Regions:
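A short macromolecule-binding patch
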Residues: 99-108
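Short, well-ordered beta-strand segments in soluble/periplasmic domains
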Residues: 45-51, 61-64
Length: 115
């Protein structure tokens, strides 16, 4: 699906994301970083932070622990972009997820999108 965003850029995502407020912990080599998923799909997420996070590197893959109301889901996410000028947030593309966690994530997204 391609459509224009408010900024006028073409959307590249194939699967639309839904707006959420789910806690996320990112595991790094130096410890963990807590954030919040602002939007998510089964293919990726935008994660917001209370302050600027400098110790995450573009194109690097991190372990993400996503806490929905129903489940804790583990995915490996590649950091594909960083937006620090408006809101401390980063975009992740999911590169590895078990079938079980993918099913849990899909179920949580479907349930949350009906609210």
């Amino acid at each position: 699906m391609r459509y224009r965003t408010l900024s006028g850029l073409k959307e590249k995502r194939k699967v639309p994301r839904i707006e959420v407020r789910w806690p996320v912990t990112i595991i790094t080599e130096k410890g963990s970083v807590d954030g919040e998923a602002g939007n998510i799909s089964v293919e990726g997420a935008f994660i917001m932070f209370a302050h600027s996070i400098e110790n995450l590197s573009l194109s690097k893959t991190y372990r993400l622990l996503i806490n929905t109301a129903e489940a804790k889901i583990v995915v490996m996410g590649k950091l594909v972009w960083s937006k620090l000028d408006i809101l401390p947030g980063k975009g992740f593309c999911f590169v590895e997820i078990t079938e079980g966690d993918r099913a849990l994530l899909r179920k949580a997204i479907q349930k949350y999108s009906k609210k």
